[in-house]
Amino acid sequence: MYKISLLIFILTLIVPTYILGSYNYKNNNIKYSFPKSVLVSKKSDTYFFNDLGFRLFQGNCLIGNIYTTFPSNKSIQLIRKIEDKFINVDFGGEITTVKIREGFSNSNGSIILIDLGWKSIEDIKNFFDKKFKISLILKGGQGFDLNNYFDTNSNSWNIVGISKALDEATKLCNNL
């Protein structure tokens, strides 16, 4: 599952990446790859194709991209109609707008990659501080009906240990 999420994220950036190594740090998956970056992911509490991921790139290891995926039983042709569109979401109690980056074919339909934005690692850690679990609720599409594309509108992740995993990922990134 993680390899699929990694592949999806990499293809979204149109960057050829080859895994150089990986390990687990207290239930957090950490991988590093080429071009030089470090990935941290948390498995969903709810769905198989819904990891919450963080990617840090060499050269600016203090900023990370946050992303997730949602499964859909809709065809890839239909999902492609909402690529680069925006969704209003509730992420950890904060209302914000995120972007649908891309859709990918899956044996059961499609996988939708959602970009939750770029944040400093310290801001991410502060946002997750004292939380054991975080949820993402899709509120509404801008110019489209979510129900026509998404099978579910929410997901959650256990984020215990994520701050230490991000610290470890930052150290790895700085040593790339």
Per-region residue spans from a language model:
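Classical Sec-dependent N-terminal signal peptides that target proteins to the secretory pathway
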Residues: 1-21
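A generic "folded-domain core" signal
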Residues: 17-176
